[in-house]
Every structure is written in structure tokens, then in C-alpha cells.
From Swiss-Prot:
Biological role stated in the UniProt entry: Catalyzes the ATP-dependent amidation of the two carboxylate groups at positions a and c of hydrogenobyrinate, using either L-glutamine or ammonia as the nitrogen source.
Residue stretches making up the GATase cobBQ-type domain: 269-459
Protein name: Hydrogenobyrinate a,c-diamide synthase
Cofactor(s) listed in the protein's UniProt record: Mg(2+)
One Pfam family hit: CbiA
Species of provenance: Thermobifida fusca (strain YX)
InterPro entries in the record: CbiA/CobB_synth (IPR004484), Class_I_gatase-like (IPR029062), CobQ/CobB/MinD/ParA_Nub-bd_dom (IPR002586), GATase_3 (IPR011698), P-loop_NTPase (IPR027417)
Catalytic activity: hydrogenobyrinate + 2 L-glutamine + 2 ATP + 2 H2O = hydrogenobyrinate a,c-diamide + 2 L-glutamate + 2 ADP + 2 phosphate + 2 H(+)
Site entry: Increases nucleophilicity of active site Cys: 451
Lineage summary: Bacteria, Bacillati, Actinomycetota, Actinomycetes, Streptosporangiales
Top-level taxon of the source organism: Bacteria
Pathway info: Cofactor biosynthesis; adenosylcobalamin biosynthesis; cob(II)yrinate a,c-diamide from precorrin-2 (aerobic route): step 9/10
Keywords, in A-Z order: ATP-binding, Cobalamin biosynthesis, Glutamine amidotransferase, Ligase, Magnesium, Nucleotide-binding
Miscellaneous information on this protein: The a and c carboxylates of hydrogenobyrinate are activated for nucleophilic attack via formation of a phosphorylated intermediate by ATP. CobB catalyzes first the amidation of the c-carboxylate, and then that of the a-carboxylate.
SUPFAM superfamilies: Class I glutamine amidotransferase-like, P-loop containing nucleoside triphosphate hydrolases
Amino acid sequence: MSGDVPAAVLPRLVISAPTSGAGKTTVATGLMAALRAAGYDVSGHKAGPDYIDPGYHSLATGRPGRNLDVHLHGENLLGPLLLHGASHPRPADLAVIEGMMGLYDGKLGGRGFASTAHVAALLDAPVVLVVDVSHVSRSAAAIVAGMAVFDQRIRIAGVILNRVGSRRHAAEVASAVEDVGVPVLGALRHDSGLAVPSRHLGLVPAEERAEAVAAVELLAERIAAQVDLTAVVEVARSAPPLHAQAWSAQEALRAAGFHPVSAQRDHPVVAVAGGQAFTFRYAEVEELLRAAGCRPVVFDPMSDPALPDGTAGIYLGGGFPEVYAAELAGNTALRTALRDAVRSGVPTVAECAGLLYLCRDVDGAPMVGALDAVGRMTSRLALGYYSALAPAETLVAAEGDRVPGHTFHRTTVTSTGEQAGPAWLLDGQPDGFSSDPAGIGRPTLHASYLHTHWAGCPQAAARFAAAVSTQRPC
């Protein structure tokens, strides 16, 4: 980051672990909630592309949970996005960033690219390690010592012991860890009631847990009782000034060449799928749409009988439509309205769950039918980072554009009829559908498995908003 950029003071820390499954989400979410209860305004962030953890962060902090991903955003955008999240909707006192996987685990073959350590180094943020000691005692200190010296850019500023068996066990481990020069900030007793249940893609979204609010409150109580919050805040305050300027949706659109159309109506409505079946979308998507003059309106495909009044664009993000297939299938009126809107040329972006929802059916349950394709649940997890190529002009990309994205699903979509071209090429393989269902001479439907973060590709938001601004409401 340039030395010419004014320094921003933002206390911050990263919560990481040596491995997956150590309890990062439990500790990070509980820590955010405990700090909030102690009077701090906390900005919650997730390293990596995951949608689920930020939902818990939002419950814990009372503000949007946000992502920081080196692949999706690029190295230079992480600081600006962190500062943006920490200043909206109001200035935060500190930022807590939950890592992904193990501290040094990143893109395969990338030597740690996009790892939590990569994020921590770019943000010059101290790291607090969550160490699962359920099957270890003094050997945990060797793990901490190794993590501390593996990469000299990383400062391990503290350890929180998780799943300790007794006070004696905690004291034994803490003594060994502190002997290698790393302070122990807390020790959490083993408590199965604090675990976050798993879904086939990872954790269960907060929106799907009726008891989520109570669970987060319980986490806050347990963390406050067993972790030294004052010491945690001091770790966050030890982070140096950050040489970056907060990201701006307006500036991002301007840089992408977006210019409001003179004939644009006042704030055209973009219908954004929400509810329990569609929980996966990044906060910056709606912020970019608002900055472009659109009015995002969230609707629930499971229960709403119609699209929002004046819909001129549709955004169907990710989620679990296969889990709620019966409920989605039962909302015949909404499925019909959505199919008619897509076929009439209303600009529509559908990612992963949105792609499935637009199919004719998913595992036999009738869906929207805007695509002549069927979706099926499988046992195989397809995931990875991609630099997607637009093979032709689409609703969100110009021919030849490269856009960063990621996939994460256990389903397949099979075309059962003639479709238009693919939405993207992923490592040379076609993915999704780009089509002109109304025959107006340009693509108005973009449906694929690829998840994109529009802060990292604002040209996608700009193109979509431009199409929406000239669309006649359905």
C-alpha cells in the first residue's frame, strides 16, 4: 500500500488456528458478541469467500458481516474493504477477522496465496491462534512455536485454548505455551452445546437456525467468562496504522466506466432473492447497486406470491434451494412470475443456487423453468478458485473479460434442450448459460455456478445496473 495514502487507525486482529475444525467460528463469533456486550462496536470480517460465517458475525455484531479474499479482491483492495466495513453503517471501535482453514493454508499450489496468513500480512494484523487441545497438552506449545516462526511476516500475538478438559489441563498447556513466548488469552472448557452444526457445504447458516440468536448470546457469556477481553483489545490496538483509504462503491463504479443513463427512471427496483433458501450474497453487491441508482428489494422465493412491485432486474444469489425444494416448488405463483419476467427479458443474474432455481426441476421438485435444464444433488463437492473467462458478451461481462470467482457446490445441472452459450469458461470448460430469452438482441440472462464478488469486478455491477436502468418494469 502506498506511503502517500493517509494512515488509518483501526484496531484489528485475526482469529486463526493451526487446522480446520479447531473452533475458529465459535471463538470468533463469541468474541465479537462478547466485545459488543462489553460496549465495543465490532466490525466482523471473514478471510476467504465463505458466506455462512459472516451470517453469524452479523448476529454477533449487529452490522453486516463482510469478506476479505485475496483471490476475489486482489491484494490492493483488502485494506480499503476492511476500512469500508469498519466505517459502515457507523465507525467501529475494532475489527475482528476470522480466518479460514489453517493459518497458512491457501490456494492449492499457490504457496499460501489467499491464506489467512496472506490476509494478515497484507493488513499488518496480529494473529490470535485458537488451538484445540482436546487430545494434547504440552505438545500444543510446539505447534504454536512452529506457527510463530514459519513466516516472519506473521505475528502470533496470543493463543486461546479450546476444548480443555480441566483446570489442571488448561494450566499445563498454558504454562508450556507461555514458555515459548506467546501469551495465553483464555481457555475454553469443552462444551458440545457451543458447536455450530454442519451443513453439506460447511456450517449451517445463521438464518436457518431458529436458536441462532440465543446461541450467539450464550457464546458471548462463555467467552466473556473464560477469555481476557481486555488483553484481546490490547492485541487489536497493537496493530499499526493502515495505509489505505476506505473502499467506495461510487468510486468503484466510476472506475469501471459506469455512467448513469440520462433516461433512467428514479431508482429502478432490483429484486434480490433472500429468505432461508437464498442466504448467500455479499453485502457489497447491494451497496454497488444502490450506488448505481438502483433500489435493491429483498424477496423470499419460499413465501412471497409475487416479485416486488416495479421489478426491473433480478439477482438470485447462493444458498440451499435443494434443502428447501418442496417449499420453493409449492410457491407456484412466484415461480410463474419469475419465469415470465426472465422470459420477457428482465435482466437476471443467477449464481449457483440461483442457477438451480431457474432450472425445470431439482431432484424432481419443480422449479422456475426459465432454463431447459435439471438440477441434481450429488455426493461430490466441487470447489475452487477460478479466473473465469467470458467467451462472448454477456449481461455482466464483455467478451474476453477475466473475472475472479469461486465455486462451492454438491449439485450438477444438465441441459435438456437447446441453450445459448455458456456464461463463463472455467479452466476452458463451459459453465452455466448466457442467453437472450426475449430475443431483444443482447443477453439478459446470466446463470452459472460461479460466485463472484462485485467489489473485485465492479464492471459486472456496472453492466448489470446499466441494463436494469433501461429495462421496462415487469
